[in-house]
Amino acid sequence: MPDFFSFINSVLWGSVMIYLLFGAGCWFTFRTGFVQFRYIRQFGKSLKNSIHPQPGGLTSFQSLCTSLAARVGSGNLAGVALAITAGGPGAVFWMWVAAFIGMATSFAECSLAQLYKERDVNGQFRGGPAWYMARGLGMRWMGVLFAVFLLIAYGIIFSGVQANAVARALSFSFDFPPLVTGIILAVFTLLAITRGLHGVARLMQGFVPLMAIIWVLTSLVICVMNIGQLPHVIWSIFESAFGWQEAAGGAAGYTLSQAITNGFQRSMFSNEAGMGSTPNAAAAAASWPPHPAAQGIVQMIGIFIDTLVICTASAMLILLAGNGTTYMPLEGIQLIQKAMRVLMGSWGAEFVTLVVILFAFSSIVANYIYAENNLFFLRLNNPKAIWCLRICTFATVIGGTLLSLPLMWQLADIIMACMAITNLTAILLLSPVVHTIASDYLRQRKLGVRPVFDPLRYPDIGRQLSPDAWDDVSQE
């Protein structure tokens, strides 16, 4: 069975996904007028606006923190370690490339989710890829297919991956039994997810910034302490990225395809650009200024923080301690624990364990929120279905601590590809709408007015929208 999963992954990620992700990212970069570069200087202002409260939804900052909670999981630690061991230091460079290109894709999918959102019976905004497939494309069947993929991925597999990382970290540092880890983590997860969307969002708006700051500041201090090695580390990234590094002295050599494949894989698992997960959080926000593009820009910040800041910090720590092959017998999170012991002494692994617990717990909780959101699209938002999903998540967290790491990641990669292919197909078909959103936002900014989306200006789009999603702002 592992060989079968490995074959499927090699087909999907050896060619199909790389070309699709790269092509979609380049296409949306062009169609949006290089949106990730145009507004990068506005990230600070966008963050300031994101705390502006609006009725009927989360603040943009709460939405960003919820999406970051899902992004900033063990993929930022274990995933980076796996990328370096499988693709060499050059995989880090291709993670950066994938992140910059992915910003445009994220802008597109999150803007569409915000545009096609609707209110549930409680007045809370709901939306995501399933909604823009149904409303924007008129293909509800496609939305149902995507929602099922997401329920499998976020309700089951990805939470197991995160739990696996916690179990391995605790076992490596304290020889803690994986089953006990799974039970304790599952109980805390159940307590958190019963708080609902708003409760989780309030929890994450304080939790996520704190844990990110702890990890990044620690990494910066270690980099400063080892500043003499940084030029060599940075050169090794670029040298390996383009296949210049030859196998010599018994060390493993890495091909260009290995670096690109692993860089794109791990970048996508970490920042989720194009996968269709983040739009579920983006749609829940009452955007400020009241324009779909404003939420798209806020969610681009999430990719910047996730990959270009947090993942880079993890990569630097691993490469400062060795070249990624030094601890080849170790897998994933254990590799970065070993690296931190080299850099920080005996308590380095224990520190990583604490960070992994924080990252993975927040990711598991946010993963559940995404899955529950899609129950609403499938019209299964009744107490029985919701509790069934909660029990599945509870069981998956326990089960994930007992499975092997390679098998968990292979399953994650396959379902991630299925989600991405479905979502990217939809947003590429909706690219004229993305172009309209981006152009309308830019037009109003050039006029010096606060961007406000008016569906009456675009009647073809307006007819596709939920009648109560944008009526209020169109009259401002």
UniProtKB/Swiss-Prot annotation:
<feature type="transmembrane region" description="Helical">
    <location>
        <begin position="351"/>
        <end position="371"/>
    </location>
</feature>
<keyword id="KW-0997">Cell inner membrane</keyword>
<feature type="transmembrane region" description="Helical">
    <location>
        <begin position="141"/>
        <end position="161"/>
    </location>
</feature>
<protein>
    <recommendedName>
        <fullName>Uncharacterized transporter YaaJ</fullName>
    </recommendedName>
</protein>
<feature type="transmembrane region" description="Helical">
    <location>
        <begin position="81"/>
        <end position="101"/>
    </location>
</feature>
<keyword id="KW-1133">Transmembrane helix</keyword>
<feature type="transmembrane region" description="Helical">
    <location>
        <begin position="233"/>
        <end position="253"/>
    </location>
</feature>
<dbReference type="GO" id="GO:0005283">
    <property type="term" value="F:amino acid:sodium symporter activity"/>
</dbReference>
<feature type="transmembrane region" description="Helical">
    <location>
        <begin position="207"/>
        <end position="227"/>
    </location>
</feature>
<comment type="similarity">
    <text>Belongs to the alanine or glycine:cation symporter (AGCS) (TC 2.A.25) family.</text>
</comment>
<dbReference type="GO" id="GO:0005886">
    <property type="term" value="C:plasma membrane"/>
</dbReference>
<feature type="transmembrane region" description="Helical">
    <location>
        <begin position="414"/>
        <end position="434"/>
    </location>
</feature>
<keyword id="KW-1003">Cell membrane</keyword>
<dbReference type="InterPro" id="IPR001463">
    <property type="entry name" value="Na/Ala_symport"/>
</dbReference>
<feature type="transmembrane region" description="Helical">
    <location>
        <begin position="391"/>
        <end position="411"/>
    </location>
</feature>
<dbReference type="Pfam" id="PF01235">
    <property type="entry name" value="Na_Ala_symp"/>
</dbReference>
<keyword id="KW-0813">Transport</keyword>
<feature type="transmembrane region" description="Helical">
    <location>
        <begin position="4"/>
        <end position="24"/>
    </location>
</feature>
<keyword id="KW-0812">Transmembrane</keyword>
<feature type="transmembrane region" description="Helical">
    <location>
        <begin position="174"/>
        <end position="194"/>
    </location>
</feature>
<keyword id="KW-0769">Symport</keyword>
<keyword id="KW-0472">Membrane</keyword>
<feature type="transmembrane region" description="Helical">
    <location>
        <begin position="300"/>
        <end position="320"/>
    </location>
</feature>
